């Protein structure tokens, strides 16, 4: 009883999700299919030939009954029987070619869509990723694309072949007996009219199911990584997490049951309609045969043709529902493709000059605020899709110059804008006002890939892919030899550690490098930076999480890494920047002090307070979390 009530609840559940599919979505799908026009034409030719062949066997059946069996002609019966077999073999061969053609077009279109989606997403600004649920995004790139793929690959052939089959079958029926054919057509509106409404309903269910699946994927993505799993264990909440996941999975189950029951009820209704139509044809046609108006062979042929008519009509109606479900997938994919990218290459972007980059950096009256949600994200991929206003100004009137080979240190309290300032150099964000130049070139006029090739960054928590040590190092220079790796690791004071690993450079470091210590990860990141050989280096709290021993080793490695390069160093431990060519003190997004260590220490300002706190062994300024927002 409880199960029955549950099913009734599932059946009656109403989605509040919009259920219409826009013309723009359909137009864009056809746009992706445009490169395959020649293959589509060939596919249509094969489908047409196969559909025309489909009416041959019923006509042969008429001849077998009227011209062979009724006449007692065994030779004619044998020939006609062989022709039926030949027609079936030809149809089978054409069906194989038809399937190959539809799969080629469908899979090719999805390949193009998947690559375009991946390329677009990875070029989106960091602000997109800070707002987006990773699980929902992965679901969009994976599940939704697969949903579109299945529908297109299977439905493309179904729609075209069944449409042509229905048309040729109906024409043949009229040629055989127009009165019976008119009766067969009476039920056609009952196949066609409900399809639009049913399609909308199923599309709404499909869209809701995809959203629920994305929510479930987000939960798994956040919990099934080292940091998430560790947090759950340390707080002793596996039971609560399982309960929460069960609730999400239960909603996915309910929507799946609803979809299955609704779809099955529709198929049953179509089957009953087809059976009713076939019965009408046999009843009326049988009466005509009894009266001598048509032959028994014609009646048998029409019975087969009617079955061939209602079958494709039912499949076409179902295909319409499948197509609308597929367009839901496309709609969700296009939503990501339309995600705004405020940090794109300018249409008139120029390549970097051929001569070597000197590393002269200048900030000209730079101001910055973080973009609002509608400027840099997709609402349906956020946990809270409530629109917000543009962020407050976090950097205001910054004027700085860093000469080639010089070190600029940026210090200040947490939230003062240190990491934000550094993130503007590789254009993880663009300035709101003012400009930044590298060797006299406005960063916004340069191609991003060329700009970033000249900038190296080491953060307090460097990212390592779940891959080998060698693969992580070669991410900076894919063509690097083992000798190049040795040289970089030696300079980064990590070569001895690598050689002690079980498989050397082939040792897998684990997700985010969790199999390495913090100091080892930092030194691998420095080795990777040395392989990149940038003109400008940014160190964002690179030693803030290390103990004294590891910090000393990393500082030696950093000294080699910074030699001859322009450097911006964001420091929590002021002892690491006492030798900087210039120290800039930020507070609430503004430069409040600047100078060398001795000058600032003796000036009695904010820097002196931070230095005094360091001397006393107190915590002065909290460290940021890498390049990105500094917090409120």
What does each model-found stretch correspond to?
Residues 35, 39-52, 154-209, 281-294:
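Transmembrane helices of ABC transporter permease
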Residues 12-15, 34, 40-94, 101, ...:
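Transmembrane helix-loop-helix hairpins at lipid-water interfaces of multipass membrane proteins
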Residues 30, 34, 38, 126-127, ...:
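An intracellular "coupling" helix at the cytosolic face of ABC transporter transmembrane type-1 domains
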């Amino acid at each position: 009883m409880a199960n029955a009530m549950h099913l009734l609840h599932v059946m009656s559940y109403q989605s509040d999700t919009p259920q219409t599919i826009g013309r723009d979505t359909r137009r864009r799908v056809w746009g992706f299919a445009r490169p395959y026009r020649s293959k589509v034409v060939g596919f249509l030719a094969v489908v047409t030939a196969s559909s025309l062949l489909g009416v041959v066997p019923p006509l042969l059946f008429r001849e077998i009954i009227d011209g062979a069996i009724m006449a007692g002609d065994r030779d004619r019966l044998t020939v006609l029987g062989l022709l039926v077999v030949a027609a079936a073999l030809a149809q089978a061969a054409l069906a194989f070619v038809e399937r190959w053609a539809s799969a080629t077009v469908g899979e090719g279109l999805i390949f193009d869509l998947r690559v375009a989606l991946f390329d677009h997403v990875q070029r989106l600004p960091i602000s997109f990723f800070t707002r987006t649920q990773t699980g929902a995004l992965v679901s969009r790139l994976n599940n939704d694309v697969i949903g579109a793929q299945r529908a297109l690959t299977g439905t493309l052939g179904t729609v075209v072949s069944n449409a042509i089959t229905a048309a040729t079958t109906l024409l043949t029926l009229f040629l055989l007996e127009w009165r019976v054919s008119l009766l067969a057509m009476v039920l056609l509106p009952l196949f066609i009219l409900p399809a639009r409404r049913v399609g909308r309903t199923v599309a709404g269910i499909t869209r809701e199911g995809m959203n629920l699946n994305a929510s479930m994927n987000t939960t798994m993505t956040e919990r099934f990584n080292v940091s998430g799993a560790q947090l759950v264990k340390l707080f002793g909440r596996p039971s609560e997490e399982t309960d929460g996941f069960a609730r999400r999975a239960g909603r996915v189950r309910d929507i799946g049951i609803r979809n299955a029951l609704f779809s099955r009820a529709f198929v049953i209704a179509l089957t009953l309609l087809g059976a009713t139509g076939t019965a009408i044809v046999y009843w009326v046609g049988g009466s005509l045969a009894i009266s001598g108006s048509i032959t028994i062979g014609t009646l048998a042929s029409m019975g087969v043709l009617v079955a061939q008519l209602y079958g494709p009509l039912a499949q076409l109606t179902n295909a319409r529902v499948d197509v609308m479900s597929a367009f839901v997938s496309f709609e969700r994919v296009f939503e990501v493709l339309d995600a705004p990218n405020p940090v794109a290459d300018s249409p008139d972007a120029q390549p970097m000059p051929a001569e070597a980059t000197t590393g002269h950096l200048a900030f000209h009256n730079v101001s910055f605020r973080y973009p609002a949600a509608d400027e840099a994200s997709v609402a349906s991929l956020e946990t809270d899709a409530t629109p917000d206003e543009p962020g407050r100004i976090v950097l205001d009137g910054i004027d700085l110059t860093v000469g080639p080979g010089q070190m600029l240190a940026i210090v200040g309290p947490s939230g003062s804008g240190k990491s934000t300032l550094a993130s503007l150099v590789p254009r993880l964000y663009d300035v709101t006002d003012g400009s930044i130049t590298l060797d006299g070139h406005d960063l916004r006029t340069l191609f991003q890939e060329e700009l970033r090739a000249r900038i190296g960054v080491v953060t307090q928590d460097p990212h390592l892919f779940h891959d080998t040590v060698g693969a992580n190092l070669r991410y900076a220079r894919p063509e690097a030899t083992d000798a190049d790796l040795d040289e970089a690791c030696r300079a980064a004071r990590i070569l001895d550690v690598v050689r002690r690993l079980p498989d050397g450079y082939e040792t897998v470091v684990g997700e985010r490098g969790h199999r390495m210590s913090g100091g080892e990860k930092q030194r691998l990141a420095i080795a990777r930076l040395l392989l990149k050989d940038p003109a400008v280096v940014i160190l964002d709290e690179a030693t803030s999480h290390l103990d004294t021993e590891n910090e000393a080793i990393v500082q030696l490695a950093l000294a080699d890494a910074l030699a001859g390069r322009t450097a911006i160093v964001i420091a929590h431990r002021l002892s690491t920047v006492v030798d900087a060519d210039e120290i800039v003190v930020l507070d609430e997004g503004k430069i409040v002090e600047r100078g060398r260590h001795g000058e600032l220490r003796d000036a009695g300002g904010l820097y002196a307070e931070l230095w005094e706190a360091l001397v006393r062994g107190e915590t002065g300024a909290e460290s940021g979390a890498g390049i990105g927002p500094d917090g409120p």
